[in-house]
A protein has these predicted regions:
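Enzyme catalytic cores with a strong preference for nitrogen-chemistry domains
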Residues: 1-200
């Protein structure tokens, strides 16, 4: 499977600008004919959106951006587009949005995986803004059984997260479901020496 990793820097709160970046990338990757384009965590809204998520208009605007993404995907019907977005709560029981990985192809949302593990330590306060995933699912595409995780979901059993912080392990759940390919989308806040830390 040909996958294009679309590493780019969205601007927090600039939904129109972020969508335009995505549109340009969708167009510019056409000659390579990837079957899947992968964008970062919360790409549509920018990361970290924090208190913007407290505004109903911001969530509504994000869902409208997702509708526009569906239209953009029609220009490349052979390519699936995986993008991070704050997804509006469904029903009345869940008022907080989810931090979601949404897959769109040929005008349709064909898969969605919400983030399972919401960090609330150090600079992170995601439990305040988001509802966690209820489960992890497998996406079958291009002959693969794909597990999609979002940032913290992949770190549950690593030395980077305090032991016992989370009750479930999405990686273990996906392994038990027999995934053949794992995709993790992530974003993290900038700080001084971040690039040096990433390289080392």
């Amino acid at each position: 499977m040909r996958i294009a990793l679309c590493q780019c820097n969205p601007v927090m709160g600039d939904l129109a600008g972020n969508l335009e970046k995505l549109r340009r990338i969708v167009r510019s990757t056409a000659p390579e004919s990837p079957e899947l384009l992968v964008f970062p965590e919360l790409f549509l809204q920018g990361y970290p959106p924090r208190d913007l998520l407290e505004n109903a208009w911001f969530i509504s605007d994000g869902m409208r951006s997702l509708e526009q993404l569906r239209e953009i995907s029609r220009t490349r019907p052979e390519t699936a587009i995986l993008v991070g977005a704050a997804f509006a709560a469904s029903g009345t029981a869940r008022k907080r949005p989810t931090n979601a990985a949404v897959v769109v192809r040929d005008g349709e949302v064909i898969f969605r995986q919400d983030k399972s593990l919401l960090p609330s330590y150090d600079v992170f306060d995601e439990t305040r803004y988001f509802a966690p995933a209820r489960d992890v699912d497998v996406w079958e595409y291009g002959g693969e059984r794909i597990g999609i995780t979002i940032c913290e979901d992949i770190w549950c059993s690593s030395d980077l997260v305090p032991e016992g912080l989370y009750e479930r392990d999405p990686m273990k759940q996906l392994a038990e479901k027999g995934v053949s390919l794992l995709i993790n989308i992530a974003a993290s806040p900038f700080h001084v020496d971040k690039q040096r830390q990433r390289v080392s």
